[in-house]
Amino acid sequence: MKRRTDPECTAPLKKQKRIGELARHLSSTSDDEPLSSVNHAAKASATSLSGSDSETEGKQPCSDDFKDAFKADSLVEGTSSRYSMYNSVSQRLMAKMGFREGEGLGKYSQGRKDIVETSNQKGRRGLGLTLQGFDQELNVDWRDEPEPNACEQVSWFPECTTEIPDSREMSDWMVVGKRKMVIEDETEFCGEELLHSMLKCKSVFDILDGEEMRRARTRANPYEMIRGVFFLNRAAMKMANMDFVFDRMFTNPLDSSGKPLLKESDIDLLYFADVCAGPGGFSEYVLWRKKWHAKGFGMTLKGPNDFKLEDFYSASSELFEPYYGEGGVDGDGDITRPENINAFRNFVLDNTDRKGVHFVMADGGFSVEGQENLQEILSKQLLLCQFLMALSVVRTGGHFVCKTFDLFTPFSVGLIYLLYCCFERVCLFKPITSRPANSERYVVCKGLKVGIDDVREYLFSVNIKLNQLRNTESDVNLVVPLMVIKGDHEFNDYMIRSNESYCSLQIKALAKIHAFVQDTTLSEPRQAEIRKECLQLWKIPDQARVAPSSSDPKFKFFELIKDTDINIFSYKPTLLTAKTLEKIRPVLEYRCMVSGSEQKFLLGLGKSQIYTWDGRQSDRWVKLDLKTELPRDTLLCVEIVHELKGEGKAQRKISAIHILDVLVLNGSDVREQHFNQRIQLAEKFVKAVSKPSRPDMNPIRVKEVYRLEEMEKIFVRLEMKLIKGSGGTPKLSYTGRDDRHFVPTGVYIVRTVNEPWTMGFSKSNNRKFFYNKKTQKSVYALPTESIAPFHTCYYSRLFWEWGDGFHMRDSQKPQDPDKLSKEDVLSFIQSHNPLGP
């Protein structure tokens, strides 16, 4: 026998060591790695060594033993056994235990004969649990679904050519019958086979764990990654989606000639209502898009699903006013209560000059867990009340968008028919942001017609009847006779096509989720790509949702004024005296306002975070101790005035914010605009932020501005009134447009024309003109360079101080010879007014 150190024995040992290392490498290969990629001879060598090691533990193998083992393993590897897919190590281990193909292990071959199946365990199901009914095949080919696409098509109902039904015609339309709680036989507007197939696909998920279904749905929906972007929920992105698809008809409505109905420079706001829409995603989108150029009214059910205005991170919730029907802010917001519908309607009309809103959004829904197939029936009154609310508050020519579910029952289709009669155009639309597997779709209505009051009153009576029949065996089954609906063939055909189209898409989407539940490796590869395409198309920045950070008022002030010289804000007005009276010689260039207290700068950082500053650099911004709210990034020039209402003991006092001028409105820098335009924008801004439903809040008003040549109008508003706490001595008071009065301290006089321009009046053409004193050029149109920006108006302003030395009439003995009387100023203005007395 050769020694271990002999060359003949050492070489095979080194070879064996290399093969052993290869064996250890192969034995650690996972089941997911293809064994066939490994060289067959190397596998045989490695596994033979492993087998040899197990048989000769503690012995040193020689070259002859190795050759025999290699040969044996090669024979095993080449067999045609159905177990040949297992490596030879496994086969040899089984052979050592006495395994023979077709027999079980054990003394009497009583062991298991079949291979143990791969685990089908899914999620957190109990070990071995199978869901009877779910694991069966649906026999639906979902793979031929359309390719994901960011571009969508809209199909409108044909234009309604029939007259809007009147109360006489509708007097016998409402049909009351036995309450119906089945949907399977509703085949008037959808094929029976298609309806049953859709209901079957829905029912399959009844026994599936909700979380498991949601995970599969997330992977299956190609549009799932759009989510809510930086808004508070996905609903906001649905509105963004539909607003784009319908050519911005909500956020940028057009007139009959196709021109924008509203411009940002106009004084009119875009009014909208958001009903049954907590927490408010629709409104957050609209206010993000329009900023302070829009004002929203909202009504939704009080409780956990109320508006969450504090979560409006991307928009200013100060521009939105919830009103819950009867009782106002203390109401319950139940849209099915007739009192709430009437109260909300009156509130909206009172605050939109009796015109109504430009559009209504409704997104109502509630949990129907366990009764998903009956969602349409269970939601019928909610749907009716949302339609009724739209007809109650939308102005003529306005629009409406409302979430619906399945539309199979004649009751639901009848409601759609009434909208079809009342609006110029109507369509049923499912945006790609609405998950394809649910029944959700939206009815979109464009251009409310004149003369819909009878339909509104009819729906109001139907709602009353539904309330009366609640908790009984009877129900309103029809609001429009089937004969009338089917008599309009174009409407009927569209309704059937729409239902069957959405049914088919929903069936495929449900089957796809079913497949994704069964195979957890399936996923939609283009989700990120589609998301990017959609956001670009809808002009939504791809940004994360981040809560607004709190700002230091001084830092925010410098951020808003940019590079403006800080010294401008410390300028005090020039006092109007006999010596400075000549400054107002160009009368047409000036405007004037009545003052009630000291002027301050007011900075809004959002909600009640409001600070004031008197303009001196040595002083700090001080928190305003008033109950009011302003949108963030707002900078105003104001007075805090003590307003009075009534006289004597019943007199009430309230502190109000009076706006003298505006610099920045909710991030919009308006300092370079004309003073008249700035005041108009201030009035628009105040309408947007005012809260008529909150009498507990301190009001915000814009100073009433007069032309200097019309200053005598101010004195018409002045009278002597008894002021509580003044010792019974009447004081001079100025009464504003809102019937509240305050003690005036003087008049601000503001120049609106920039040097070297001045204003004149052409008697031959009977119109004003602008004259450049340097170039001696005259023009009628307002030159841009003649507009005095805020800083010019501010440092050049004059102040006619009244105080104790002011006297209204010449008969009054002057107490201060340096102070000008009413007669002094008015006579000077009249003598220099080119328009004449």
UniProtKB/Swiss-Prot annotation:
Annotated positions binding S-adenosyl-L-methionine: 233, 276-282, 334-335
Gene this chain is encoded by: Cmtr1
Membrane-crossing segments per the record:
none
Instruction: State the signal peptide span.
Output: none
Q: Where is this region: Disordered?
A: 1-66
Q: Which PROSITE patterns match?
A: G_PATCH, SAM_MT_RRMJ, WW_DOMAIN_2
One Gene Ontology cellular component term attached to this UniProt record is: nucleus
Q: Can you give the residue ranges of the WW domain? A: 751-785
Give the Gene Ontology MF terms in alphabetical order: mRNA (nucleoside-2'-O-)-methyltransferase activity; nucleic acid binding
| Superkingdom of the organism of origin | Eukaryota
Domain named G-patch is located at 86-132
- Basic and acidic residues bias spans: 56-66
- EC numbers: 2.1.1.57
| Cellular localisation | Nucleus
Name positions with the PTM Phosphoserine: 27, 30, 52, 90
Name all RrmJ-type SAM-dependent 2'-O-MTase domain ranges: 230-449
Q: Is Acetylation among the key words of this record?
A: yes
Reaction catalysis annotation: a 5'-end (N(7)-methyl 5'-triphosphoguanosine)-ribonucleoside in mRNA + S-adenosyl-L-methionine = a 5'-end (N(7)-methyl 5'-triphosphoguanosine)-(2'-O-methyl-ribonucleoside) in mRNA + S-adenosyl-L-homocysteine + H(+)
Keywords annotated in UniProt:
Acetylation, Methyltransferase, mRNA capping, mRNA processing, Nucleus, Phosphoprotein, S-adenosyl-L-methionine, Transferase
The catalytic site is made up of 238, 363, 403 (proton acceptor)
Q: What are the binding positions for substrate in this chain?
A: 202-206, 217, 373-375, 438
Quaternary context: Interacts with POLR2A (via C-terminus).
Q: Where is this region: Interaction with POLR2A?
A: 726-834
Q: Where is this motif: Bipartite nuclear localization signal?
A: 2-18
GO term, biological process aspect, one: 7-methylguanosine mRNA capping
Q: Which PANTHER family match?
A: CAP-SPECIFIC MRNA (NUCLEOSIDE-2'-O-)-METHYLTRANSFERASE 1, CAP-SPECIFIC MRNA (NUCLEOSIDE-2'-O-)-METHYLTRANSFERASE 1-RELATED
For this entry, the protein name equals Cap-specific mRNA (nucleoside-2'-O-)-methyltransferase 1
